[in-house]
Amino acid sequence: MQAGRLLLRKAWSALLTIGFVLVLNFFLFRVLPGDPARAGIKDPRMTRAAQAAIHARFGLDKPVLNCLASLNPLRRGPCLVSPLQTQFFIYINNLLHGELGISFHTKIPVGELLRARLWNTAVLLSAGQTLAIVLGVAGGVLAAWQAHTRIDYAALIISLVAWSLPTFWLGLILLFWGSRYAGLPIGGQLTPGLAAAGTWAQFTDAARHLVLPTLTQTIIYLAEYLLIMRSTMLDVLAEDYILTAKAKGLSTFQVLKDHALRNAALPIITIVALNLGFTVAGAVQIEAVFSWPGLGQAIFESVARRDYPVLQGAFLLLAVSVIVANLLADLLYSWLDPRVQAAL
């Protein structure tokens, strides 16, 4: 019963947040300066007729809301259209049908453009975050268990140095090392002119291209997870029930696995969920350094081109991903710590 109440409460809160994000996502990219038509074409000789035609093609000739100005600077007169013909209603209606608009630059649907990019970013983030979580948690547990020893001090120093490194700088260093000493590809996702898709050669080539960007992300986030896990594990190991478990004659592995790790892992779950948005933001730098064709690189290119539909679609995907990740983290948190459900 309590679990059901918690699920409904968290799901309702997530839906309200997504609704707010949808409204913010609509207005945020319509108050930005400049004319999207000129930004997409970049032709100073564009006539007013051509500019109006582009506005009509992308729906920018309609009012944002009823009786509010549209993005079309050529429109004059009062706003006498139906609310169903406004940009906001069309935007919501398109979202309900899975449409994110048309790119100003490539003239293809934003959903189609972001789908492939999102998959590439998901592969990169999954590989990097999985390694960072596993190694960071294991390193934090080891450092806490060996507190105030050479192992602990070495883990602290290395983690603090790694955590303070700028993402792009670390990427450039690994790029130089990987290309010169390890023979790894310096950028891209696949070697041009490779065999047909689905072959073993293509899989191994893609894996080699993934090594350096994954390693960059792993080093940055491994340090954070190790430091947090060490701190929380030290607090847990000082609890009375840990001393009782040791007094019962349980092995070190049993004490850590059955009594300490579950409670010490709670802050890590929250940090991983919150890091999702920051991870994608960091992926912009990583994908730019290694020319990885992911969502971060699409955002970087769209900012330079002022391709607002792509930015709007990417912002929406990132926001919804973070909200869903936090919802899952809250539910997992309540499962690991029954006190959360008891507090309802």
Label for each model-derived stretch:
Residues Q2-L6, L118-I151, T167, G183-L344:
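Alpha-helical transmembrane segments of integral membrane proteins
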Residues A14, P44-R45, I133, L160, ...:
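Residue-level recognition of pore/gate-forming positions within transmembrane alpha-helices
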Residues A3, L7, A11, A50, ...:
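Hydrophobic alpha-helical segments of integral membrane proteins
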Residues S13-F26, R30, N120, L124, ...:
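Helix-terminus/capping and membrane-interface signal
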Residues A14, R117, T121, Q129, ...:
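Residue-level signal for discrete positions within transmembrane alpha-helices
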Residues I18-Q85, G178-F203:
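Hydrophobic alpha-helical transmembrane segments of membrane transport/permease proteins
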